[in-house]
Amino acid sequence: MIFELSRANVADNSGAKQVGVIRVLGGSKKKVAEIGDVVICSVKKALPSGDVKAGQVLKAVVVRTKRNTYRSNGSYIRFDDNAVVILKDDGTPVGTRVFGPVAREIREKYPKIVSLALEVL
């Protein structure tokens, strides 16, 4: 569960290291982002040589959350950190690599992110 004003790590090589969530997209009543949800975020920490600079406002998709994500078979998955992958306007990832595992729940909507990830849980 990622709320507004939460901080999240960036799981790609776009140049950003940490972002702050400004808004959760998906309707005015949606207050919490789960795995696979798109958020609007501001880059808080970035590498000086990266494609993304600190202060930029971008869209990102949530790929890992600390909160349990329950699956239909009764099991759940939980990660060590909250992480996002930064997206371009057309919905493709900015980076060319995805670090760390990503959840299986994003397979249908974001196949490009799953293909870049080393591990899908």
From Swiss-Prot:
**Keywords carried by this UniProt record:** Ribonucleoprotein, Ribosomal protein, RNA-binding, rRNA-binding
Disulfide feature: none
Gene Ontology terms, MF aspect? large ribosomal subunit rRNA binding; structural constituent of ribosome
Subunit-level organization: Part of the 50S ribosomal subunit. Forms a cluster with proteins L3 and L19. In the 70S ribosome, L14 and L19 interact and together make contacts with the 16S rRNA in bridges B5 and B8.
- InterPro entries listed in its UniProt record: Ribosomal_uL14 (IPR000218), Ribosomal_uL14_bac-type (IPR005745), Ribosomal_uL14_CS (IPR019972), Ribosomal_uL14_sf (IPR036853)
Q: Please, one GO biological process term?
A: translation
What species does this protein belong to? Mycoplasmopsis synoviae (strain 53) (Mycoplasma synoviae)
Question: What task does this protein carry out?
Answer: Binds to 23S rRNA. Forms part of two intersubunit bridges in the 70S ribosome.
What protein name does the entry list? Large ribosomal subunit protein uL14
Task: Return the Gene3D superfamilies for the record.
Answer: Ribosomal protein L14
What family name appears in the similarity comment? Belongs to the universal ribosomal protein uL14 family.
Top-rank taxon: Bacteria
Name the GO cellular-component terms.
cytosolic large ribosomal subunit
